[in-house]
């Protein structure tokens, strides 16, 4: 019913003049959403489900789009999914199921459609490049030998040389991308390094004393031997996952309305940690329609904490509740019932947030994070079974992460509507 209320004109226009009768976008979209909401993600499994499952036959209007049609539709219209998410939230608001206020933010590592064993490190690429060049030189010398040494049966020198030269070209391309990433990283680290130097110098001038502590370490230019690129999905990154070990992943971010548990915005990034993800999410939240209400507070764990993030929330007129340190396992039993001293006049945004987190209301709101955004991520991964992206590339996985969020929201709306 919700899909029938969505404005799909942009999708419909894309099919005009195709020459052959096509499945209606609403049918294909419904099939995909129902699949992601019930743990059926692959296009071949979706096609088979339209034959085997009564529920899928109903959703697909007893039609049977093949896997190629479903997969092409999914890839083609990924950019439109985020707009459809907003439409669904507006429908939920009209049904009085959501009104923005307090939002919780969290991130989770989602496996990429690539094996970590397909990764090539910069150090290994140098060794492999040297080895292949030596092999090519030996093969060329063998080809030019005047005594026409006998070759092993089935061995073709041109083919062997061409195969190694192809690998050398692929390695050179991979090295160039690693070097480009290293240059970008160096520029960012150099800017941070210079800012720290300027801060030390300014403080020294203010106090008239030499700077205390060790000076910041200057960044190193160029790639490190351990810098790597994945040859299957070069935009994915090696990340540490819960339970131990490392996998080829993306970092999927979700912002959840704390009352309805509906996902209001998502983001997918290549960074392992969450510290740089507050400001991008604030920009996304700012694009939500006024009809949904205004985000009043943003709740996040200590992985998101930095002074810059707290100040960014203040500039957006959003109250931050970001843990500044991990919670103690055995806190003082009186702490929960003791109000903090009054906040001093002229307190900074960070000091105001620290004070807020010690108040009864602040503690209660922050505690809700554990029963809002964390369960949503848990359900997406453990109940819906979405633990790995099917698509490759940052732009594509962002669209697929939106599709997951859209499926979750429709599933959640069904529960909220009773």
Indicate where each model-derived feature is located.
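Anion-binding and metal-coordination hotspots
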Residues: 39-52, 63-418
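Secondary-structure boundary/capping residues
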Residues: 8-11, 59, 294, 389
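Basic, short loop/linker segments at the boundary and entry of helix-turn-helix/winged-helix-like folds
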Residues: 1-33, 38
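Helical catalytic core of nucleic-acid polymerases
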Residues: 7, 17-21, 25, 50-62, ...
């Amino acid at each position: 019913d919700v899909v029938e209320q969505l404005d799909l004109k942009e999708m419909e226009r894309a099919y005009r003049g195709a020459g052959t009768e096509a499945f209606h976008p609403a049918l294909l979209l419904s099939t995909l959403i129902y699949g992601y909401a019930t743990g059926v993600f692959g296009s071949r499994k979706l096609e088979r489900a339209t034959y085997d499952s009564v529920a899928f036959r109903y959703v697909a209007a007893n039609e049977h789009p093949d896997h190629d049609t479903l997969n092409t539709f999914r890839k083609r219209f990924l950019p439109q999914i985020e707009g459809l998410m907003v439409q669904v939230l507006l429908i939920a608001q009209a049904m009085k199921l959501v009104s923005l206020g307090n939002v919780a933010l969290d991130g989770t590592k989602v496996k990429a459609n690539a094996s970590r064993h397909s990764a090539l490190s910069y150090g290994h690429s140098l060794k492999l490049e040297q080895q292949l060049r030596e092999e090519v030189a030996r093969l060329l010398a063998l080809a030019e030998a005047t005594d026409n040494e006998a070759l092993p049966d089935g061995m073709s020198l041109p083919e062997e040389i061409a195969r190694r030269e192809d690998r050398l070209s692929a390695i050179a391309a991979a090295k160039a991308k690693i070097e480009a990433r290293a240059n970008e990283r160096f520029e960012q680290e150099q800017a941070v390094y210079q800012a720290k130097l300027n801060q030390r110098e300014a403080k020294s001038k203010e106090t008239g004393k030499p700077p205390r502590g060790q000076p910041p370490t200057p960044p190193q230019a160029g790639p490190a031997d351990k810098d790597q690129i994945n040859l299957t999905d070069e935009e994915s990154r090696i990340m540490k996952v819960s339970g131990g070990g490392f996998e080829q992943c993306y970092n999927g971010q979700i912002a959840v309305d704390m009352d309805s548990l509906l996902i209001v915005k998502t983001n997918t990034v290549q960074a392992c940690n969450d510290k740089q993800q507050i400001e991008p999410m604030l920009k996304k939240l700012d694009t939500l329609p006024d009809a949904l209400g205004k985000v009043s507070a943003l709740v996040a764990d200590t992985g998101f904490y930095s002074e810059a993030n707290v100040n960014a929330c203040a500039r957006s007129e959003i109250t931050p509740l970001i843990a500044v340190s991990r919670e103690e396992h055995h806190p003082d039993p009186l702490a929960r019932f003791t109000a903090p001293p009054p906040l001093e006049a002229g307190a900074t945004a960070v000091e105001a947030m620290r004070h807020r987190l010690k108040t009864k209301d602040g503690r209660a709101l922050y505690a809700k994070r554990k029963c809002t955004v964390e369960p949503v991520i848990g359900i997406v991964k453990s109940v819906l079974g979405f633990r790995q992206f099917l698509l490759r590339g940052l732009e594509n996985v962002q669209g697929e992460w939106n599709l997951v969020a859209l499926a979750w929201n429709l599933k959640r709306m069904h529960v909220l509507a009773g």
